[in-house]
Amino acid sequence: MKKIIMTLTLLLAVITVNAQTKVYLTKEISPDALVRIYNALGVKAKGRVCVKISTGEGSNPNYLKPTLIQKLVDDVDGVIVENRTAYPGDRMETKDHWDVIHKHGFDSLFAVDLMDEYDEIRIPVKDHTHLKYDIVGGHLANYDFMVCLNHFKGHPMGGYGGA
């Protein structure tokens, strides 16, 4: 049986001044380990919390399984959020993307929000060199706090990806 090693990275965007970047790693890939890493950050999720993930392509088994992330999502009282992809595949169109979300079991355990299902918003980029704004799903404005869960992956579009 082919073993697939997933590297989980829990990212939390916190604005700090003159702070050293800390990286938290675990050898244990489990629901409890995810909660321990999150708690080590020392930052409590407040308000309307979303948990950004990649729900994976329909035929691809490499994504963060709902049962792996369930304890953390429940602990922060989060809503799973995802966006459609810019490349052709099972998540490029809204209906197909919802089919993948269902097939992979996310909607059976969590509230799920496809952030760019209906609209998008532009967020200005400060001190821009190449981009004046970033386009994100319009539903992002509905949340106060985001926890981002990533798994390491390579993309045929030209590089490594995240959530």
Predicted features by range, described:
Residues 10-12:
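Compositionally biased, low-complexity intrinsically disordered regions
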Residues 14-16:
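N-terminal signal peptide c-region/cleavage motif recognized by signal peptidases
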Residues 4-8, 18-163:
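N-terminal and secondary-structure boundary signal
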